Structure formats: structure tokens, C-alpha cells
Amino acid sequence: MKLKRYLLVAKPGIIFGNLIAVAGGYFLAARGSVEPMLLLATVIGLSLVVASGCVLNNCIDRDIDRHMERTRGRVTVTGQISLKAALAHGLVLGVAGFGLLWWRTNPLTTALAGFGYFVYVGLYSLWFKRRSQYGTLVGSLSGAMPPVVGYCAVTGQFDAGAASLLAIFCLWQMPHSYAIAIFRLKDYEAAGIPVLPVARGIAVTKIHIVLYILAFMAATLALCLGGYAGYGYLLVAVAVSLWWLAIALTGYWTADDRLWARKLFAFSIVAITALSVMMSIDFQVAPATHLVASLP
């Protein structure tokens, strides 16, 4: 039972979602030439880093979590795990994760994981989530790191493929997160979290959702146009983007915003999972040019 508490505080659902993303980035870069030990180290290392960030986020958010129906049962709120124990748990996970990435991958991969960790814990959790409607945008940078980490673990450099992954996953995060904020609106209002639907209303948020999905659609094409992914990936990318956009547009005449937002959220998971799978299996030879020189 005690072990279960320590598992839950690390948000296993989020860890699993990030596993799919980091694997997608890795396989896209590997192009069929998989090094099992590197893949294992990347997946386990990043999972530990993500788990650490989630634990520290729970520690930071315990004062606002008690006001939200969805989070008031978290072990850091109920006291089933003490603050000191949770902090120690989070720090141990972080040290283990970063240590494994440094040992078995490369400095760039470790630095990217560190950047995502800093953004999530230091910028998003401690400051922007509580004080700004732009918190979601800041948080999207950390949410987009897993596939980039997986990709750069193979290449050791930040090239156009890595930049495309960063754009795709950043842009995906926005409608995904806004959908959650809409169907959990009362929770966010009760906790005083100034997400866009709270700060500017659902009508404005719907406009942002449509615009971000359009931008996401354009970004997904970059992997194919840049020679990183094939036509199978392209077909799936266009299909899921158009379907997601269609769901978003129905929000303008829906009678139930919460139900609509749940549908939008659910399909966002389908969309990003489908893209991660397709980029893993439908890869192409990368172009020789790169945006940024590799790190030693």
C-alpha cells in the first residue's frame, strides 16, 4: 500500500504518455538502426526525470490541489505521504534519471531533459501556472521535450527534425490543455488558477483552440516535407489533424461545452499517439543539413 502511494505521486499516466512520445522521437531518428541499450537508457532515464518533476509538482501544488475535485485526493494533500518524504522521493528519482541519461546518452540529451525539467518545475509549477494565463504556453515547452530527447539521444544534435518535433508537440499541448481547462473549469476557478478559459472565457478559448490546431496541422507536415517521415505518416497526420479540427469547430454550436471539451481532449490523445506510432515506423533518410551544430 505504501509503495502504491509513492507510485501514484509520480503520476504514472503522465509517465506512460511520455514513454510513447520519447519512443516516437527515438525511432524516427534511429531509422531502423536501433541500439537496445541506448533505447532502454533513454526511456528509463527520461521516465525517472518525468516522475521526479511530477512528484515535485505535487509538492508545490498541494495548497491549490485541495480546492480541486480532481486532485484533492492526492497523497500529498491527504498527508498519506509527508512533504519531506515526497521531496526526497522526487529528488532521488531526478538524480537517478539525469545520472542515467548522462551516463548512457549524450550531453545534449541530458541538457534538453534538464531544460524541460526546469521549465516544468521552476517556471510553470512555481510561477506561471498560478499567476498567468500564459502558463499553459510555458508548460508546453516542457511537455514537448520527451520526443526531442528521444530523437537527440540518437543523433546527438538539434537539427530540423528535432525542431519539427518540438513545434508539433508544443502546438499539440495547447488545445489538449485548454480542453481539460474547459471541462474542469469549476476546479480551476475554485483553485484560482488563471488558465485561459478562466481569464478570458470559453468563447475566446475556442478561437485559440482552432488556431493552434491549424498551426499543429502545418507543423506535422514538416517531418514529411523535410524528408524525415514518409507518405504513410503524412496521410495519418492530415487525417487526424482534419478530424481534430472538425471536432474543434463543432464547439461553436455545441449546447454542452463540457461534453465537447471531453471529446476534443479524448481525440487529442488519439492524434498524438497515432503520430508517434507513424513516425516510429514510417521514417525516411534525413537531410544532411542541420539547424544547430552538435554538442560534443
Curated annotation (Swiss-Prot):
<comment type="function">
    <text>Converts heme B (protoheme IX) to heme O by substitution of the vinyl group on carbon 2 of heme B porphyrin ring with a hydroxyethyl farnesyl side group.</text>
</comment>
<feature type="transmembrane region" description="Helical">
    <location>
        <begin position="207"/>
        <end position="227"/>
    </location>
</feature>
<dbReference type="GO" id="GO:0008495">
    <property type="term" value="F:protoheme IX farnesyltransferase activity"/>
</dbReference>
<keyword id="KW-0472">Membrane</keyword>
<feature type="transmembrane region" description="Helical">
    <location>
        <begin position="83"/>
        <end position="103"/>
    </location>
</feature>
<dbReference type="GO" id="GO:0048034">
    <property type="term" value="P:heme O biosynthetic process"/>
</dbReference>
<dbReference type="GO" id="GO:0005886">
    <property type="term" value="C:plasma membrane"/>
</dbReference>
<keyword id="KW-0808">Transferase</keyword>
<dbReference type="InterPro" id="IPR044878">
    <property type="entry name" value="UbiA_sf"/>
</dbReference>
<keyword id="KW-0997">Cell inner membrane</keyword>
<protein>
    <recommendedName>
        <fullName>Protoheme IX farnesyltransferase 2</fullName>
        <ecNumber>2.5.1.141</ecNumber>
    </recommendedName>
</protein>
<feature type="transmembrane region" description="Helical">
    <location>
        <begin position="36"/>
        <end position="56"/>
    </location>
</feature>
<feature type="transmembrane region" description="Helical">
    <location>
        <begin position="7"/>
        <end position="27"/>
    </location>
</feature>
<dbReference type="Pfam" id="PF01040">
    <property type="entry name" value="UbiA"/>
</dbReference>
<keyword id="KW-0350">Heme biosynthesis</keyword>
<feature type="transmembrane region" description="Helical">
    <location>
        <begin position="108"/>
        <end position="128"/>
    </location>
</feature>
<dbReference type="InterPro" id="IPR000537">
    <property type="entry name" value="UbiA_prenyltransferase"/>
</dbReference>
<comment type="pathway">
    <text>Porphyrin-containing compound metabolism; heme O biosynthesis; heme O from protoheme: step 1/1.</text>
</comment>
<keyword id="KW-1133">Transmembrane helix</keyword>
<keyword id="KW-1003">Cell membrane</keyword>
<keyword id="KW-0812">Transmembrane</keyword>
<dbReference type="InterPro" id="IPR030470">
    <property type="entry name" value="UbiA_prenylTrfase_CS"/>
</dbReference>
<feature type="transmembrane region" description="Helical">
    <location>
        <begin position="134"/>
        <end position="154"/>
    </location>
</feature>
<feature type="transmembrane region" description="Helical">
    <location>
        <begin position="163"/>
        <end position="183"/>
    </location>
</feature>
<feature type="transmembrane region" description="Helical">
    <location>
        <begin position="265"/>
        <end position="285"/>
    </location>
</feature>
<comment type="similarity">
    <text>Belongs to the UbiA prenyltransferase family. Protoheme IX farnesyltransferase subfamily.</text>
</comment>
<dbReference type="InterPro" id="IPR006369">
    <property type="entry name" value="Protohaem_IX_farnesylTrfase"/>
</dbReference>
<feature type="transmembrane region" description="Helical">
    <location>
        <begin position="229"/>
        <end position="249"/>
    </location>
</feature>
